[in-house]
Swiss-Prot record:
Listed SMART domains: CYCLIN (SM00385)
GO terms assigned for molecular function: cyclin-dependent protein serine/threonine kinase regulator activity
GO BP annotation list: cellular response to nitrogen starvation; nucleotide-excision repair; positive regulation of Atg1/ULK1 kinase complex assembly; positive regulation of autophagy; regulation of transcription by RNA polymerase II; transcription by RNA polymerase II; transcription initiation at RNA polymerase II promoter
Miscellaneous comment in the UniProt entry for this protein: Present with 8700 molecules/cell in log phase SD medium.
PANTHER family assigned to the protein according to its UniProt record, in alphabetical order: CYCLIN
Name of the gene this protein is made from: CCL1
Keywords, comma-separated and alphabetical: Cyclin, Transcription, Transcription regulation
InterPro entries: Cyclin-like_dom (IPR013763), Cyclin-like_sf (IPR036915), Cyclin/Ssn8 (IPR043198), Cyclin_C_2 (IPR031658), Cyclin_N (IPR006671), CyclinH/Ccl1 (IPR027081)
Protein's name in the database: Cyclin CCL1
Self-association state and partner proteins as the record states: CCL1 and KIN28 form the TFIIK complex, a component of TFIIH holo complex. Component of a complex consisting of KIN28, CCL1 and TFB3.
Any one of the GO CC terms: nucleus
Disulfides per UniProt: none
Function of the protein: Regulatory component of the TFIIK complex (KIN28-CCL1 dimer) which is the protein kinase component of transcription factor IIH (TFIIH) and phosphorylates the C-terminal domain of RNA polymerase II during transition from transcription to elongation after preinitiation complex (PIC) formation, thereby positively regulating transcription. TFIIH (or factor B) is essential for both basal and activated transcription, and is involved in nucleotide excision repair (NER) of damaged DNA. TFIIH has DNA-dependent ATPase activity and is essential for polymerase II transcription in vitro.
Lineage, uppermost ranks: Eukaryota, Fungi, Dikarya, Ascomycota, Saccharomycotina
Length: 393
């Protein structure tokens, strides 16, 4: 059998026939590199996030967030004090009754409001998980609830009345279809109570329902760590870290890091909590310092010398990639360590603390209850459990 002749040459002698698959791939990559514009920069997840409505509307500095909460609290205090004044003017109160009102019908502080919001945000998570809703729906419900109480005060809208509404709206937002009647039945609520504050919730969210959660970056980092540290990480161990980080991310959504950091940064912070040495090594390998020095991170893995052509090509790719991102690993580590400390330092209030705050909140909104309680006390009736029955947390 003879080879097909092309211009006097065998097809076996042509470059396309003798070129290996790896060489072809390298040639295509080289062509792509040459075709890139001079100011080419790869778009990262952080870049995409910073063009989202979530970033524009719900990202704050620490001072901005504090100021927003103080303003919301101040408006509610003015509203409560006006109602208390109207109540006193409308009723002929005794001196003792006035003293009781002044002592117990006191508006909540900003810190007390935040504690109550955090307590009920945890309840949103527990209820949503009890309903076997997907992780993304649970995360969105938590986000909706906490954002709602940046715009509104617990002294004006009872947190309990908005819990099921946020979960149901999260189902719709994340395309998890369930009818309102089915949802109300599963949540042991009613159709009217689920829908009562839905428009108010939408209005408070500024009709911005798309959420960027840290779960997607977690999957990306899970794959990229295995690629960057190829042969140096145990897959079973990485699987365990992945599962634990998903839980940590859900816990992180109950903190203020969602207002200060991007989803990939939050993901890296949760990974840092699980294994700081692994994350440090990954970042320093992927984004080497600009001076070319690279600190070693202690580990149990043995590194084997690799001097073949494929290793050289991989190193070139990593170098090009890190130039495109222009990320300083030391600076990034500083940022995610700050995020990590906020996640770890956040402690939700206990049930007992939440009950005290809820009772105080109930009294300032319902001063007549205090007067009735005082009268029953003067008549020798038991009043110890009256508010607890009305204000179950």
């Amino acid at each position: 059998m003879t080879d097909i002749q092309l211009n006097g040459k065998s097809t076996l002698d042509t470059p396309s026939a003798t070129m290996s698959a790896k060489e072809k791939e390298a040639k295509l990559k080289s062509a792509d590199e040459n075709n890139k514009p001079p100011n080419y920069k790869r778009i990262s997840d952080d870049d995409l996030y910073r063009h989202s409505s979530q970033y524009r509307m719900w990202s704050y500095t620490k001072d901005q967030l504090q100021e927003k909460r103080v303003d919301t609290n101040a408006r509610a205090i003015a509203y409560i004090e006006e109602n208390l004044l109207k109540f006193r003017e409308a009723h002929n109160l005794t001196e003792e009754e006035i003293k009781v009102l002044e002592a117990k019908a006191i508006p909540l502080t900003m810190e007390e409001e935040l504690d109550l919001v955090n307590f009920y945000a945890k309840k949103v998570q527990v209820i949503a998980q009890h309903l076997n809703l997907p992780t993304e729906v649970v995360a969105t419900a938590i986000s909706f609830f906490r954002r709602f109480f940046l715009e509104n005060s617990v002294m004006q809208i009872d947190p309990k009345s908005i819990v099921h509404t946020t979960i149901f709206l999260a189902c719709k937002s994340e395309n998890y279809f369930i009818s309102v009647d089915s949802f109300a039945q599963k949540a042991k609520s009613t159709r009217d109570s689920v829908l009562k504050f839905e428009f108010k919730l939408l209005e408070s969210l500024k009709f911005s329902l798309l959420n960027h959660h840290p779960y997607k970056p977690l999957h990306g980092f899970f794959l990229d760590i295995q690629n960057v540290l190829y042969g140096k990480v145990d897959l079973n161990y990485m699987g365990q870290i992945y599962d634990r980080c998903k839980k940590r991310i859900t816990a992180a959504l109950l903190t203020d890091v969602v207002y200060f950091y991007t989803p990939p940064q939050i993901t890296l912070a949760t990974l840092l909590i699980e294994d700081e040495a692994l994350v440090t090594r990954y970042l320093e390998t992927k984004f080497p310092s600009r001076e070319g020095s690279q600190e070693s991170v202690p580990g149990n893995e043995k590194e084997e010398p690799q001097n073949d052509a494929s290793t050289t090509e991989k190193n070139k790719e990593k170098s090009t990639e890190s130039e495109e991102y222009s990320i300083d690993s030391a600076k990034l580590l500083t940022i995610i360590r700050e995020c990590k400390s906020i996640i770890e330092d956040c402690k939700p209030p206990s049930t007992e603390e939440a009950k005290k705050i809820a009772a105080k909140n109930y009294y300032c909104q319902n001063p007549s209850t205090l007067i009735q309680k005082l009268k029953r006390k003067l008549n020798g009736e038991d009043t110890s459990s009256t508010v607890e029955k009305k204000q179950k947390t």
